[in-house]
């Protein structure tokens, strides 16, 4: 007999460290954080320009 055939199934398939839903939540939280880091500075610049240049409020 081979040594591979004598190995129990639990040893061949390791258990996941984290559940699937935890991994999905981490990925979603990362997407939300990265999106806010990209959009918040741009929004702050648009609001600043609209307040400091009221004549050009329509064109940013």
From Swiss-Prot:
Question: In this UniProt entry, which residues are annotated as the site Cleavage?
Answer: 19-20
Q: Which Pfam families match?
A: Smim3 (PF17307)
UniProt induction comment: By NGF.
* Record's subcellular location: Membrane
Q: Where is the signal peptide?
A: none
Q: Where does this protein come from, organism-wise? A: Homo sapiens
Gene Ontology cellular component list: membrane
What InterPro entries does the database record attribute to this sequence? Smim3
Record protein name field: Small integral membrane protein 3
- Which keywords does this chain's UniProt record carry? Membrane, Transmembrane, Transmembrane helix
List the transmembrane segments: 20-40
Q: How does it sit in the membrane?
A: Single-pass membrane protein
What PANTHER family does UniProt report for this protein, alphabetically?
Answer: SMALL INTEGRAL MEMBRANE PROTEIN 3
List the Gene Ontology MF annotations in alphabetical order. identical protein binding
């Amino acid at each position: 007999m081979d040594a591979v055939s004598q190995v129990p199934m639990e040893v061949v398939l390791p258990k996941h460290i984290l559940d699937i839903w935890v991994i999905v939540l981490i990925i979603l939280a990362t997407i939300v954080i990265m999106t806010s880091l990209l959009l918040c500075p741009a929004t702050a610049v648009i609001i600043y320009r609209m307040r400091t240049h009221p004549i050009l409020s329509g064109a940013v």
